[in-house]
Amino acid sequence: MVTVGEVRKAQRAEGPATILAIGTATPANCVNQSTYPDYYFRITNSEHKTELKEKFQRMCDKSMITKRYMHLTEEILKENPSFCEYMAPSLDARQDIAVVEVPKLGKEAAQSAIKGWGQPKSKITHVVFCTTSGVDMPGADYQLTKLLGLRPSVKRLMMYQQGCFAGGTVLRLAKDLAENNKGARVLIVCSEITVVTFRGPSEAHLDSLVGQALFGDGAAAVIVGADPTPAEKPLFQLVSAAQTLAPDSCGAIDGHLREVGLTFHLLKDVPSVVSNNIEKCLFEAFNPLGISDWNSVFWIAHPGGPAILDQVEDKLGLKPEKLRATRHVLSEYGNMSSACVLFILDEMRKASSNDGLGTTGEGLEWGVLFGFGPGLTIETVVLHSVPT
C-alpha cells in the first residue's frame, strides 16, 4: 500500500512552472488619444464644461498614450445615454454587455495562445479567468470553457474585482497549480472592458476623470505548465511569487460596484506609495538570488500611469530602456488593468526575438513582473528567461 507522501510526490511536477504561450486581443474600435477629449465631451453632452475639458485635454496629453481600444462605440453610447451621465443608474445595461463581451474577448486571446502553444486544447487541465469588468453566475470561466469547447472536467477558477495587480496574481496561482499537479496545463485569461467604468465628467471627482483618460480594453491569455515537452516552446520560467499590502496605503486605490456601475477612486499620492515600497519588494524577491542591481534584470511593470513609472524609474535609478516594453504597451493600448502585464510579457518576448537578443528577456537572464492595485496591493513575480 502506498503512503500519502508517495502519492504527493507523484502528484508534483519536477521542474518550475513555465509560460508556454501568450496571446492577446482587443476590440476592433480604436480611439485616438489626441482627439479623445473632443469626442468624450461631445458624446457625454458636456461641451459646456470648458474648463473641465481643458483639464481633461491636459490629462490626455500627459498620459503618454497614443491610442486605446474600446468596445463602447459611439453607436452603443447613443443607445445607452445613461452611460454618458456621471451618476445615472445603469448597472443592468452595463452588465448585459459585459457578461457577453468579456468572455468573448477572452476567447480571442485564448485562441491566439492555444495556436502559439501548438498543442491540442484537450490538454488544458485548468482555467483561471480574471476580470474586474462584470459579475455573473455561472461566470466567464464557464462561458470561456463553452466557447473554446474545452473538456467538461477542466478545473475552473473565477477571479472577480481584483483590479490592476491581478496580472501578477493569476501567474502566482498558475505557478502553484502547475507545480503541484504533474502534467497540468493551466490556461489563464485576463479580460477587461471599460463598459462598467465609462461615465461622464464631474468637476467634483477628478480622480474619475483620470480613469477616463487612462483605461482601455484588452484581453490576454497565457498557458502555464511545468516540465515542458519537446513539442512545447518555453518563454519564461516562474521562479517565485509574492503578494503584500503596502503600509499606510488604505484607500489609495479602491473601487465600488454600484447602480451607476463600477466607480474608481485614486489618491494623488499613489505614485509615491508605489515608488516608496517597490525596493523592499524587490529586495525580498531577489536577495536569495544575490541580485541587487535593478538594471541587471528585465522589467515587466504594470504601467498604471506615466507619473508612477517616472517615480519608480527615479527611485530605483533605472535606465530609460528598462521600462521600454512597459511604456510601449501603455502608449499603444492604455491601462488595461489586469491584462497589462501579460501584454508587456508578449511585447518583450517578441521584441527580444526581432532584435536578435539572446533571451526572451531582452538578452538578460533574470527579470521581475511587478503589479499593483486596490489595497494598495503589490504583486512581485521573479522570472527567468529562456534562450531565443
Curated annotation (Swiss-Prot):
Q: Which GO terms describe its molecular function?
A: naringenin-chalcone synthase activity
Q: What is its EC number?
A: 2.3.1.74
- The active site of this protein is located at 164
InterPro entries, sorted:
Chalcone/stilbene_synt_C, Chalcone/stilbene_synt_N, Chalcone/stilbene_synthase_AS, Polyketide_synthase_type-III, Thiolase-like
Q: Which processes are annotated in GO (biological process)?
A: flavonoid biosynthetic process; polyketide biosynthetic process
Q: In which pathway does it act?
A: Secondary metabolite biosynthesis; flavonoid biosynthesis
Recorded catalytic reaction(s): these are:
(E)-4-coumaroyl-CoA + 3 malonyl-CoA + 3 H(+) = 2',4,4',6'-tetrahydroxychalcone + 3 CO2 + 4 CoA
Q: Which Pfam families match?
A: Chal_sti_synt_C, Chal_sti_synt_N
The family database entries (Gene3D superfamilies) matched by this protein are listed as:
3.40.47.10
The UniProt keyword set, sorted, is: Acyltransferase, Flavonoid biosynthesis, Transferase
Family to which this protein belongs: Belongs to the thiolase-like superfamily. Chalcone/stilbene synthases family.
Q: What is this protein called?
A: Chalcone synthase LF3
Protein species of origin: Ipomoea batatas (Sweet potato)
| Encoding gene (name) | CHS-LF3
